[in-house]
UniProtKB/Swiss-Prot annotation:
Name of the protein described by the UniProt record: Uncharacterized protein MJ1451
Family: To M.thermoautotrophicum MTH1153.
Lineage per the UniProt record: Archaea, Methanobacteriati, Methanobacteriota, Methanomada group, Methanococci
NCBIfam families: methan_mark_14 (TIGR03285)
């Protein structure tokens, strides 16, 4: 390498990254302005969390008030007489009562941190990423019931978990922001109609929430993340949606499922520094040092030989451990894109072995660097497949959330890798990274259910377009849903 290469390398501009960091708000400000306060309670494969969000109804901006996170592996063991209805990806058994106890604890703790009480909450949205341990998408309903019981044990009345039917049922001063006297809640969230018919993938709700969350989170950046778009949630399992740009409502034309953070966790377990069954990449995040980048790249390439990214075959009922229904997806006009390692995670052990080998040759920082390369390549392959299938185009925005997609150097590497696909002239203007996407999505879901809109900063509709309230009224009138 010559001296000029070194100099040009020093001055090479890093890509501009649209990264929506969670913004906070204090208690005094909360009391002063019309903030709609929502608790998002989520039980995931790796973490269980309660995140309190607050949306300023004048500006449409959503803030994180507080959060409390616990490792799901710490859920209490089933007591005598309790029925195990499922387990996490890592084999942690779950009963309705144990889940309810954990949910109660995280919810009350998040309220305590915020200096709030249950009475201060306007709505509670509950969701789960633990779908791999269930036999069918329907069984996820059992988990949702367990989450509801936990919320009620914490003192949340059922009315704060179900949408209002009339404007009069909306608490003051939020009734003036509600459009329930003009339209009804028809199931559309942020201008996207849910797929009709049978559920096509067990993590459908997660996909809906993260799409909505990235839409609201992107308001902190210059990227207009509305329809058409592709949302990618890198929790332990993969979730996400691809939408088209029809008006007033976009349709879901693609769903993502399979393994995501579980890939990083398997590699991390090879380090020998964390629990060999339930350890997560999160457990290694604080180990600093200079990595051997070339070695990290080399191993990332080797690991991708075991990572399968493809359209989910029609003859399976599980892909990447997640229950799916490809025939229903076909009927609904939805393409299922999945990520797996072997068959339903059968080759995760191979990734663990490669992780072990890499650490023996180098160190933990090199392993963490390898994770960045592995996960950024997963994004590139997902986006490339969606593009080849005609599900996204240069008009589409891509949004990424979840621990395995936005930490470390992943955003920078993802931007660089997406440039190689040559879909967009300016990748940076079409890709956004959002913290706490699922919790932000819960805040939007609560507002959509109660028709609480901010027409001046729309989150429905198409990129570059305006508010779709008028179009929605026309659409609902044509179908006899509302009358003048």
């Amino acid at each position: 390498m010559g001296i000029f290469d070194v100099i040009s390398g020093l001055f090479k501009k890093k890509p501009k990254i649209a990264y929506a960091k969670s913004q906070s708000v204090d208690l005094i400000e909360l009391k002063r302005n019309p903030y709609y306060i929502v608790a998002s309670v989520e039980l995931g494969n790796t973490t269980t969390k309660s995140i309190i969000t607050a949306t300023n109804m004048d500006t449409g901006k959503t803030y994180i008030v507080s959060k409390h996170v616990k490792m799901t592996r710490d859920v209490r063991k089933p007591k005598k007489g309790e029925e195990v209805f499922g387990e996490t990806l890592w084999g942690v058994e779950l009963t309705r009562e144990a889940v309810a106890d954990m949910v109660k604890e995280v919810l009350l703790e998040s309220l305590k941190k915020a200096g709030l009480t249950v009475d201060d909450l306007h709505f509670v949205v509950r969701s789960t990423g633990v779908t791999a341990g269930f036999a069918s998408p329907e069984e996820v309903g059992e988990m949702i019931i367990a989450l509801a019981q936990g919320c009620m044990k914490a003192g949340v009345p059922p009315a704060k978990m179900t949408p209002a039917m009339t404007k009069e049922q909306i608490p003051k001063p939020f009734d003036k922001y509600s459009f329930l006297d003009k339209i009804i809640f028809d199931g559309a969230v942020t201008g996207v109609l849910p797929p009709t018919g049978k559920e096509v993938v067990a993590n459908e709700m997660e996909g809906e929430l993260v799409t909505a969350g990235i839409k609201v989170g992107s308001k902190w950046t210059d990227v207009d993340f509305r329809n058409p778009c592709m949302s990618i949630d890198f929790g332990t399992t993969l979730a996400g949606r691809i939408t088209n740009d029809t008006l007033p409502y976009a349709k879901v034309i693609g769903n993502l499922c399979g393994l995501a953070g579980a890939i990083a966790d398997a590699i991390a377990r090879g380090s020998g520094k964390i629990d060999e069954k339930t350890g997560a990449a999160l457990d290694l995040a604080n180990i600093k040092g200079k990595p051997n980048e070339e070695l990290a790249k080399e191993y990332a390439e080797e690991m991708h030989k075991y990572i399968i990214i493809k359209e989910v075959p029609k003859d399976v009922d599980r892909f990447g451990t997640v229950p799916v229904d490809p025939k229903s997806a076909e009927k609904a006009g939805t393409t299922l894109i999945g990520c797996d390692v072997g068959k339903n995670g059968s080759d995760l052990i191979k990734l663990e072995e490669l992780g072990r080998e890499l650490v023996e040759k180098s160190d933990i920082p090199t392993l963490m660097c390898c994770l960045d390369y592995v996960m950024s390549e997963v994004v590139r392959r997902l986006v490339e497949l969606a593009y080849k299938k005609g599900l996204i185009s240069e008009k589409s925005a891509v949004g990424i959330t979840g621990r395995a997609g936005i930490t470390g150097r992943k955003p920078e590497l993802i931007i660089e890798k997406l440039k190689t696909l040559e879909i967009w002239d300016k990748v940076e203007e079409n890709v956004v990274f959002v913290e706490d996407g699922l919790a932000l999505g819960a805040s939007v879901m609560a507002r959509c259910m109660n028709c609480l809109g901010t027409p001046q900063v729309p989150i429905g509709g198409v990129r570059g377009g305006g508010c779709i309230l008028g179009l929605r009224r026309k659409w609902q009138k044509e179908r006899g849903m509302i009358r003048d």
